Amino acid sequence: MAASIFAAVPRAPPVAVFKLTADFREDGDSRKVNLGVGAYRTDEGQPWVLPVVRKVEQLIAGDGSLNHEYLPILGLPEFRANASRIALGDDSPAIAQKRVGSVQGLGGTGALRIGAEFLRRWYNGNNNTATPVYVSSPTWENHNSVFMDAGFKDIRTYRYWDAAKRGLDLQGLLDDMEKAPEFSIFILHACAHNPTGTDPTPDEWKQIAAVMKRRCLFPFFDSAYQGFASGSLDKDAWAVRYFVSEGFELFCAQSFSKNFGLYNERVGNLSVVGKDEDNVQRVLSQMEKIVRTTWSNPPSQGARIVATTLTSPQLFAEWKDNVKTMADRVLLMRSELRSRLESLGTPGTWNHITDQIGMFSFTGLNPKQVEYMIKEKHIYLMASGRINMCGLTTKNLDYVAKSIHEAVTKIQ
């Protein structure tokens, strides 16, 4: 029999976070803990369907007027409009001036990809693959892949995490922006930076915006955790809204996976802020062409759940309460873990655990210590030392804290 025409195809390495979860599932040890999963978990370690989502799903199922016809190519209009409103604010002048457009995407990744595909085709000259794209060091690993696969050839990093002080390297970040070529694209985490959990303060964001404006750099925000970081939708959108108020044209990729718990519905939105309505409409016309050959038409269920919730004052209030429940549990786990590590006298400082916000924490554990945690203690976390605070529960906190203490004291 002739060899397969695919015989020369190399096997791609597995996606790290999904491989980690697979390894966790196969582990038969009763003490095992999964701190790698990128999703919310209850104190029982279980997925949580938001009560408001259950309620809206029942409303949708009972609505005889709904059908399964195609949506518009750019997505469900009431979802797109309200998603952008959540990002930019009820009183957004940009929305009032009709210079905001949006595209429904397949989750935050889909929103990022449509933005990247458009920028490669039309930003800084037609089909300019040489425009530098800057991602934070470190960043969510998919940022690199999305922009590379969209055709950008020059992906660079800007300094962000200061390992020595376990916090933001503001001066390094600003210096890298000063040195970046004009019209470079900068991927900015709107809140709850992944993986570090370390965000700039409002004053630091102002300094970042000032440099970006002077250097003519393009802001592309990734907003995956609005409401989940601090418990406040407005506080978590502060940076995006400030940049808009400063006159920036920008993109903002939004994900509703975390704050609605709709991970497998793939609900995302790309908000486009332009100088005027005409510019935005021309951008959307090109994005429509890109969507047509990418997924052609988005799914409706998740978008309908979000739109129904955001347009009802009662459901919106209930959703905010659900989001705060998740955010508060994360804050509690941060406080409890830090307290236990300090009580154990674990070497180093641990205030960064409570200084950071959002689902993830950059522990500061090195790869050898991480390996020890996985192999000896059956506690699964990313090689970078990133942990998902939602993987902690009142039942496993003591075990995790003692294991971190052991790893830090035994392994250098």
Swiss-Prot record:
What Enzyme Commission number does this protein have?
2.6.1.1, 2.6.1.3
Q: Which UniProt keywords apply?
A: Acetylation, Amino-acid biosynthesis, Aminotransferase, Cytoplasm, Pyridoxal phosphate, Transferase
| A GO cellular-component term linked to this record | cytosol
What Gene3D superfamilies is this protein classified in?
A: Aspartate Aminotransferase, domain 1 (3.90.1150.10), Type I PLP-dependent aspartate aminotransferase-like (Major domain) (3.40.640.10)
Instruction: Name the Gene Ontology molecular function terms of this record.
Output: L-aspartate:2-oxoglutarate aminotransferase activity; L-cysteine transaminase activity; phosphatidylserine decarboxylase activity; pyridoxal phosphate binding
Q: Which InterPro entries match?
A: Aminotransferase_I/II_large, Asp_trans, NHTrfase_class1_PyrdxlP-BS, PyrdxlP-dep_Trfase, PyrdxlP-dep_Trfase_major, PyrdxlP-dep_Trfase_small
Q: What catalytic activity does the UniProt entry give for this protein?
A: L-aspartate + 2-oxoglutarate = oxaloacetate + L-glutamate; L-cysteine + 2-oxoglutarate = 2-oxo-3-sulfanylpropanoate + L-glutamate; (2S)-2-aminobutanoate + 2-oxoglutarate = 2-oxobutanoate + L-glutamate; 3-sulfino-L-alanine + 2-oxoglutarate = 3-sulfinopyruvate + L-glutamate
Q: List the disulfide bonds.
A: none
Q: Which PROSITE patterns match?
A: AA_TRANSFER_CLASS_1 (PS00105)
| Chain positions found as N-acetylalanine | A2
What is annotated about its quaternary structure and interactions?
Homodimer.
Q: Please state which protein family the record places this protein in.
A: Belongs to the class-I pyridoxal-phosphate-dependent aminotransferase family.
| Extra remark beyond the main annotation | In eukaryotes there are cytoplasmic, mitochondrial and chloroplastic isozymes.
Role noted for this protein: Biosynthesis of L-glutamate from L-aspartate or L-cysteine. Important regulator of levels of glutamate, the major excitatory neurotransmitter of the vertebrate central nervous system. Acts as a scavenger of glutamate in brain neuroprotection. The aspartate aminotransferase activity is involved in hepatic glucose synthesis during development and in adipocyte glyceroneogenesis. Using L-cysteine as substrate, regulates levels of mercaptopyruvate, an important source of hydrogen sulfide. Mercaptopyruvate is converted into H(2)S via the action of 3-mercaptopyruvate sulfurtransferase (3MST).
Q: What is this protein called?
A: Aspartate aminotransferase, cytoplasmic
**Gene it is expressed from:** GOT1
